[in-house]
């Protein structure tokens, strides 16, 4: 989660954490909105808004719901193959059930994957980002050895360039984890900005990934600088899609086409269609 400016602001991460597997938010007493003594710390409201955004994304989007469902799918095989100390007893030679593989596939599609970040890596401030065009892979989901769905998944090769000119190459498959952090940080940042925090300190000590990666990625995908409102909207609607990475690519491509061709109304139509399909999906499972 994001760091906070020591004197002027309180940001999510040091003081708050959302646990998607348990559906609860933990915020330390320093982030209280009604502290026992004195006034709330600057940025306390932004902290709560950040974590509540994760809560909403996990409970009210397709990516969040399916991430949770895929975890439920793994409960039975875990119990079946674990001893009383929760140690898995299946040997490495044992065959893995197709349904278990599919559960992990769905989880990875929904939550996303980022490859190439060294273990324990401490992100310095990135001076710039370089992104390649997204590449497509089709993931097959099976049940009882039969293919029940095919999902388009997009990955973006990315390079972070730092102030000392060294760089780090990673691959981002956008999903719930990356997109929700990007959207939550945009909301948090806007609240702090509107509260009077200086622009010079809004991103101070904030890790470049994932918080400061979402904005340049969206800018790249739409072909021009984006607004905070656009990034929040694009990210949220991407999470309503059956594939968050595809949802983000599709939404950004609609804006890009509008800009290139000078058309109007295409993005509004896309959002209406996306919302219609999500409501239809949600009504079908409730």
What does each of the following model-derived ranges do?
Residues 95-183, 188-286:
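Long, well-structured alpha-helical subdomains associated
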Residues 23-26, 56-57, 62:
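Conserved catalytic core of nucleotide polymerization and phosphodiester-bond processing enzymes
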Residues 38, 42, 58-99:
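Post-HEXXH active-site segment of zinc metalloproteases
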Residues 1-39, 69-84:
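Catalytic zinc-binding patch centered on the HExxH motif and its immediate surroundings
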Residues 27-49, 170-175:
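Short pre-active-site segment immediately N-terminal to the catalytic Zn-binding motif
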Residues 1, 11, 43, 50-53, ...:
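Intrinsically disordered, low-complexity segments enriched in charged and polar residues
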Residues 46-60, 181-185:
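Active-site recognition of the HExxH zinc-binding catalytic motif
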């Amino acid at each position: 989660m994001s760091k906070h400016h020591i004197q002027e602001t309180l940001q999510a991460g040091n003081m708050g954490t959302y646990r998607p597997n348990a559906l609860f938010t933990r915020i330390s007493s320093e982030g209280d909105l009604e502290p026992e003594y004195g006034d709330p710390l600057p940025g306390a409201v932004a902290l709560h808004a950040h974590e509540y955004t994760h809560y909403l994304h996990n409970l009210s989007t397709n990516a969040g719901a399916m991430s949770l469902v895929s975890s439920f799918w793994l409960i039975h095989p875990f119990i079946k193959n674990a001893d009383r100390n929760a140690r898995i007893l299946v040997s490495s030679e044992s065959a893995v059930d197709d349904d278990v593989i599919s559960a992990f596939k769905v989880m990875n599609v929904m939550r996303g994957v980022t490859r190439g970040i060294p273990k324990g890596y401490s992100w310095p401030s990135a001076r710039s980002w370089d992104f390649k065009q997204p590449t497509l892979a089709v993931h097959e989901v099976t049940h009882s050895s039969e293919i029940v769905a095919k999902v388009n998944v997009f990955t973006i090769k990315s390079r972070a360039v730092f102030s000392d000119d060294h760089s780090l190459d990673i691959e981002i498959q956008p999903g719930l984890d990356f997109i929700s952090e990007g959207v939550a940080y945009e909301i948090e940042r806007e609240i702090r900005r509107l509260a009077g925090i200086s622009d010079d300190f809004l991103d101070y000590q904030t890790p470049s990934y994932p918080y400061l990666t979402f904005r340049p990625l969206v800018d790249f995908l739409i072909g021009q600088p984006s607004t905070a409102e656009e990034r929040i909207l694009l990210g949220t609607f991407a999470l309503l899609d059956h594939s968050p990475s595809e949802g983000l690519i599709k939404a950004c491509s609609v804006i890009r086409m509008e800009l290139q061709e000078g058309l109007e109304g295409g993005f509004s139509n896309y959002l209406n269609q996306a919302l219609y399909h999500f409501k239809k999906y949600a009504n079908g499972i409730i």
